């Protein structure tokens, strides 16, 4: 078993005298972590404690403690792209991770568990199911990740950022920062503007080399139109981006990071960016039109699926990342830079897709399930393809867990002491 804990001094394992926390499973990328942090902020504002389960040495171990949220971590990593030998050993590693996650759940005794995706979410969600903690899933992308696909089969509620990800989903949206959701309507910002067209290019925290190359080339080919340009490029690619604009003879403000994204969106007439779920949620909340260039290597091409949702509402233009990107970007910019009416129409269309209260809605649903649950599994149910079910028995008031008849998969002991205690009960033999 490998479990480590951060910020344990800030919040000890809950006792019967304390309110039981909500556990968030999220990690690996900002796309999973930041929605979890947004929901955690809402829950804590309501007086609900939050605890986090992540993976060793992953991004969440640096970000989550900054918010004074206790985090436990598992020794787990992704399986995609691994060699045959490592894949053959994966079941053993997953079983160990589920066992370790069960240890954490018995220690933290969460009143509900929600997965936003990431390496630790799989073992954490399976342990929650086996121990009877109410489990929810929030999927940010239109093309669901592997972990949430599995967990969705036996989660109590399946929440999504975009419609069309799962059957029986609840499309609540992706959480965005309050200051972005509070921006004035597009017409209040854009109508009557004079001067150069303001273009905001977002490469994300890691930068986007394709945008670093295509945007300067496209603008130079347009004959240096009257444009005011801000390009967020990430720290690692800053020198490369500055050199590309210098070579193209295009003036641009190149920034590795933008601290005030609300002000940046309010400033922009048009955004050129990738199509991550959180970025698109911000574009909609702000109400700004965009040219979307999905990351070509994204898992299951999920960024293209995300972008298609905005394109279908006439809120964005989609360009594929390939060798002709600069030429096609030049053509699109030539049209949009000269057409303020089209830009305003795209901005209004984006705003109609916004779900600015997503974090509040997710928190509401978590607490609905936490309030209705007693720390025991829900009624017998089985979702297609997984074969996991919970059977209620009356012997000593315990629950018997069956996993497709395979006792080797029963990683969490099924005696009454191993289950999450009922509210108000003592922690019993929990470590």
From Swiss-Prot:
Pfam families: Glyco_tran_28_C, Glyco_transf_28
Single annotated GO MF: undecaprenyldiphospho-muramoylpentapeptide beta-N-acetylglucosaminyltransferase activity
Domain of life: Bacteria
GO CC aspect terms: plasma membrane
Compositionally biased residues, Polar residues: 395-420
Topology in the lipid bilayer: Peripheral membrane protein
Binding site for UDP-N-acetyl-alpha-D-glucosamine: 29-31, 141, 177, 205, 258, 303
PANTHER family linked to this entry: GLYCOSYLTRANSFERASE, UDP-N-ACETYLGLUCOSAMINE--N-ACETYLMURAMYL-(PENTAPEPTIDE) PYROPHOSPHORYL-UNDECAPRENOL N-ACETYLGLUCOSAMINE TRANSFERASE 1
Task of the protein: Cell wall formation. Catalyzes the transfer of a GlcNAc subunit on undecaprenyl-pyrophosphoryl-MurNAc-pentapeptide (lipid intermediate I) to form undecaprenyl-pyrophosphoryl-MurNAc-(pentapeptide)GlcNAc (lipid intermediate II).
Name of the protein in question: UDP-N-acetylglucosamine--N-acetylmuramyl-(pentapeptide) pyrophosphoryl-undecaprenol N-acetylglucosamine transferase
